[in-house]
Structure formats: structure tokens, C-alpha cells
């Protein structure tokens, strides 16, 4: 990419100032029914806080998206609850046995593919996303979230993180257009995470009015919705 292309991508995808306050005070947990896993108790408490913004963005960004074939790498991803019903066929691609570094080209490509909290555990993220790209239809979507800064976990299979711009460039270079780019982080979260070697939740971060700030220069996690090129 040329320097101009990098700056153009930055200007097209970087969240605007108003983005950083839109979920400062969290709404009630979305949905009605109790489900398993992350969404079991319909509460924001007890979970790594950046995922709350990620879920809210995901719901907003995908509200008008539907299709035929949904693929995903984790059955516990909370985002699945808010999109699975809009797809007729679902394909689970777990690791093991499947490795995104060696993902073959499938006969039945995806209209939407989700692989959250995975890129930091891939030794060659570009290869993995290029393989995913080969398995997404033109005009299909991919969504992923990834830490920018994090405590060591799943060592030694933990290789790094991504800035929002790094995430945008990764997808731009693998035949995707970046539709939306989100991020969250603040200094309080960073300090608590490294001091306790754990992931702070909503209760640990909220102020007396229930607010949690999102500081643009203290990004801790980011996420992207990207669309495969070749659509009209």
C-alpha cells in the first residue's frame, strides 16, 4: 500500500469523535430469552468489558444483513445469538481439528463468517484471513474482534495484537472493503488488567452514574465488519 492509500483508509474507517460516547452508559442487555454461555444471565457484569461495546456495535452494524450460509469458529461467541436466525445454514469450524492457516477452499462458501478473539493466537494472521477470504462469497461479510493490548493467555500460542488501523489494513489487503471499524479502551481498564492479571468487567470500571469512558488513545480491543470485494 502507498502512504496515500494508508491515509485514505484511515480517514475512511477511523471512528468519529461521537462514536466514543455512544455506549458510555450501557443500555440493558439486548434480547429477551436466556441462553447458554456468555449471554446466560442477560447481564453485562462478569465479562471482559470491551466485548460489551463489541456486541452493541455488532447488533447495530448487522441489523439489515441476512443471507444463506453462516460460518463461525466458536459456538460460545455472544454475537451468534443476534445473527444466527437470519441465516438458513450454519457451519461450525472448530479448532482443532480445523486450522485457519491451512483452511482449504470449500465448495460451499459463506455469506457471513465470524471468528472472534482469534487473530492474536495466529502465527500468520495474513495467511489465515486470506484463506477465509477464499471461502466468503463476493458481497459476503466477515466480523472479528481482537485485543490491541492484553495480558498473556493461552501461552505460548499468543503472538500479539492489532491496532484498529492494523486490523483495517489486514482486511484491505485480503480482498475486503472495511464497512465498519470499532474500538474500546481506557486507562483504568489497562491498569486493573495488568495489576490483577485478569479482565475487568462492568462493575469494576463503572462510575457512580454507571458510565464507563472510551478513550480513543487507550485502545484495548478493536473489531471490524468487512465486505468481500467483487459485489456490484
Predicted regions and their residues:
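Short, surface-exposed alpha-helical recognition segments that flank or form part
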Residues: 46, 120, 214
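Redox-cofactor binding/interface segments in oxidoreductases and associated redox assembly factors
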Residues: 71, 115, 144
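S-adenosyl-L-methionine-dependent methyltransferase catalytic module, highlighting the catalytic core
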Residues: 88, 123-127, 131, 137, ...
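Conserved short-loop catalytic and cofactor-binding motifs
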Residues: 103, 116, 154-155
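A short beta-strand submotif of the Rossmann-like class I SAM-dependent methyltransferase core
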Residues: 112-118
